[in-house]
């Protein structure tokens, strides 16, 4: 069962399951007292304890108040639904205007784009190409980890790869999670049946291997964490688990091209937990032409220092017509229109959205970390924002301008 929830200050309707709830606990306690409300699932992160309560029908206000009044309960909220935010020698590099904009490769049928309105990737690669020590979680619809342009830069869980089949060799609660995890089906195969996550992964770190395209990073380790189903939607429960998994394996960057829910204290808490570990959370600003200063778009507009909110620009250097914006809540822009990248089933495709702009920023941050691994997340955030290209067309829409990889590495 799904219902629409409208929250004051949120532009779009909030989707949530009417028979599924997330309960934050104040400590480790017996779950038996909650079983009268429905089926109980425990969700534990590094420092947080949650329960999911699945009921046959919606809980009444009286029942919800009974849960809230429990001395061991911090809060209870609906299990919300999130969705994707999309609308060189490598033979298809010429199609990647976001990396090198010639004008001809970035415009529409009747008009060209503008030369140079890109992230200066070619000049950036003269300074840094990436590093296998940088781990980036792609929290999305999964990734086609067998794609020939991605396979070299996919993370492998060495403990499980070299361990015993059917055994949780690394003791993290997930059996045989060699390639990451599918939190939709709760299994060890995060293969992408949608294509969105694979597209994002290619933007970050498609190999520079004379096949297809190039990602921002020549070398990296990308971890596919699938919490969005093949139809592009996922739950608060899945988001919590995916973010917690990424935190526990020690990623440096989480790339998040999704959103659409209202404020969730549980989601805030688990992102804050990642912040406490020094992890950057790059988030799509949204695609509803929305002023995020007035109408929040989560998770991008949570007031947390590790979040970098990304809007989308077009081939002429303007704000993409669909992109959300916000002078105080959108940190910077990156190309997000007709972005050519890897896709499911070992293919390639153009997609548009703040979903596409987000992994560009994740990839630039990965290059910056490769160059200066001593910088903390606050220093990296400040540096990427201070090094943006300024323009009148974007100046009123974000804190900074458009991301520039070369300047960020200088």
Q: Can you name each region flagged by the protein language model?
A:
Residues 1-18:
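Classical Sec-dependent N-terminal signal peptides that target proteins to the secretory pathway
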Residues 214, 238, 247-258, 264-270, ...:
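C-terminal subdomain of the subtilisin-like protease fold in secreted/lumenal serine endopeptidases
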Residues 68-135, 143-153, 238, 398-401:
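Protease zymogen maturation seam
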Residues 29-30, 57-60, 80-84, 141-145, ...:
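Solvent-exposed loop/turn segments at secondary-structure junctions
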Residues 103-146, 158-212, 225-236, 292-295, ...:
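Active-site-proximal loop motif in hydrolases
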Residues 72, 132-135, 218-223, 248-254, ...:
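Loop/turn elements at helix/coil->beta-strand transitions in domains of secreted/extracellular proteins
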Residues 17-98, 123, 251, 270, ...:
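Inhibitory N-terminal propeptides of secreted protease zymogens
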Residues 279, 297-374, 378-382, 408:
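Extracellular S/T/G-rich loop segment that most often corresponds to the catalytic His/Ser-adjacent loop
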């Amino acid at each position: 069962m799904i219902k629409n929830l409208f929250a004051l200050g949120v532009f779009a309707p909030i989707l949530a399951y009417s028979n599924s709830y997330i309960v934050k606990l104040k400590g480790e306690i017996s779950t038996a007292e909650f079983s009268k409300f429905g089926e109980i699932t425990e969700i534990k992160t590094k420092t947080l304890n949650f329960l999911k309560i699945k009921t046959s029908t919606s809980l009444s206000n009286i029942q919800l108040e009974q849960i809230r009044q429990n001395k061991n309960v911090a809060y209870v909220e609906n299990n919300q639904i999130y969705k994707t935010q999309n609308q060189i020698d490598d033979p298809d590099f010429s199609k990647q205007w976001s990396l090198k904009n010639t004008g001809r490769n970035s415009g529409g049928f009747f008009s060209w784009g503008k030369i140079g309105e890109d992230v200066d990737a070619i000049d950036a690669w003269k300074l840094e190409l990436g590093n296998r020590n940088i781990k980036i979680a792609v929290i999305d619809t999964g990734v086609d980890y067998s794609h020939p342009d991605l396979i070299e830069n996919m993370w492998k869980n060495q403990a499980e790869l070299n361990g015993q089949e059917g055994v949780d060799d690394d003791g993290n609660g997930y059996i045989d999670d060699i390639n990451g995890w599918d939190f939709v089906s709760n299994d060890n195969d995060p293969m992408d049946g949608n294509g969105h996550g694979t597209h994002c992964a290619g933007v970050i770190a498609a190999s520079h291997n004379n096949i297809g395209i190039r990602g921002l990073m020549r070398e990296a380790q990308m971890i596919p964490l699938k919490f969005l189903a093949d139809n592009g939607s996922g739950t608060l429960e899945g988001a919590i688990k995916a973010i917690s998994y990424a935190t526990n394996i020690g990623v440096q960057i989480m790339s998040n091209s999704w959103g659409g829910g209202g404020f969730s204290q549980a989601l805030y808490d688990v992102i804050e937990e990642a912040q406490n570990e020094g992890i950057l959370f790059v988030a799509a600003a949204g695609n509803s032409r929305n002023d995020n200063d007035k109408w929040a778009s989560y998770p991008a507009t949570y007031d947390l220092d590790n979040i970098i909110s990304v809007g989308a620009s077009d081939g002429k250097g303007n704000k993409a017509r669909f992109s959300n914006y916000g002078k105080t809540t959108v940190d910077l822009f990156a190309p997000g229109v007709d972005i050519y990248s890897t896709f499911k089933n070992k293919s390639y495709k153009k997609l548009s959205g703040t979903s596409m702009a987000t992994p560009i920023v994740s990839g630039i941050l990965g290059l910056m970390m490769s160059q200066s691994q001593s910088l903390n997340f606050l220093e990296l955030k400040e540096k990427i924002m201070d090094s943006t290209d300024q323009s009148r067309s974007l100046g009123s829409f974000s804190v900074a301008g458009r991301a520039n990889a070369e300047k960020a590495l200088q």
